[in-house]
Amino acid sequence: MNIDMVGMGPFLEHADTPLFQFQDSLLPLNERFNLSLRMIAVLRIMMPDINIVATTALQSIAPMGREQGLKAGANVLMPNLTPGKYRGYYLLYENKPCIDEDADECLDCLANRVKMVGEEIRYSEFGDSKHYIERKNQEPGTKT
């Protein structure tokens, strides 16, 4: 498969959607969380050269959810750079983290979270996956 990046996380139902009526048919939140971590781990084993996102949905279930996603095999965190005054208008699910922070606070928070799992943000590097770089280097006319 020619995949550069995957973002996946637990399904979180929203009260204003048609699927909310089926919430009783879903796995409990903690099971969805654990399943998501296992999915990240399996995907990392299957595709070691792609980018995998530790989603904010993980953090909405567990305060350290994104960190657990990183430990399971994710290697990308996506900062919320939406201006603070607009964040409340874009709530895909309840308990969305960081809606009361501005962009600078969000970036500082992410840096601290990454350090907590023994990693560091590489500000001076592009975030292209190894798979993407290799694919681009193999295209005709591309310099290696």
Where are the regions a protein language model picked out?
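Auxiliary Fe-S-binding modules of radical SAM enzymes
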Residues: 2-144
